[in-house]
Structure formats: structure tokens, C-alpha cells
Amino acid sequence: MSASADSLGAAAALDKYGDEDIFSLLIRYGLYVGALFQFVCISAAVLMENNPDGQSNPESGEVTEREGEPVRTRLHKIRKLEKKKRR
């Protein structure tokens, strides 16, 4: 019986995951909460419609093409104005 008790004692000494402190519990449950938050965000991005009215917001930062003015020229003008504002 003493050989069995010694082997159980040695196995208990090698088990480093048996005792969990507050920090490891906090990390484990924090990772679960983070994974749940990521799942909710990704599912919301996939399932939600983009502008249900079909109208685009002109102040959203998107660059659209005007009549006769290509998008590239507008981007250049926007960058030039932003650079000028920084001076």
C-alpha cells in the first residue's frame, strides 16, 4: 500500500493544473468573454444590413465619383488639403 501512496503523492506533485488561483481563473473566464464578444461582433457584421434605406451617407468618408471628375483626382485633392491643414 505504501508504493501506491507514494505514486499518488508523486502524481499529485506533478499536477501543476490542480490548484487554480484567482489570476488563472480571471484569465480563463476573460478569454471566454473575449471570444463571446468577438463572436457577437462578427455575427452582427455578417447579419446586419448595410443602409436599409438604400441611401449613402455623404459624410461617411467614402469617395464617390462626380460628373467629369475621376475619383483619383478627388483623392489627390483631399490629401493635398489635409496636408495643407497640418502646416
Swiss-Prot record:
Region spans: Disordered: 51-87
Pfam families registered for this protein in UniProt: UPF0239
Domain of life where this protein originates: Eukaryota
Subcellular location: Membrane
Family: Belongs to the UPF0239 family.
Annotated Basic residues bias: 73-87
Residues of the signal peptide: none
Membrane topology: Single-pass membrane protein
Name of the protein in its database record: Protein anon-73B1
Ranges of Basic and acidic residues composition bias in the record: 63-72
Keywords of the record: Membrane, Transmembrane, Transmembrane helix
Location, primary (coarse class): membrane
Transmembrane feature ranges: 25-47
A single cellular component GO annotation: membrane
Gene this chain is encoded by: anon-73B1
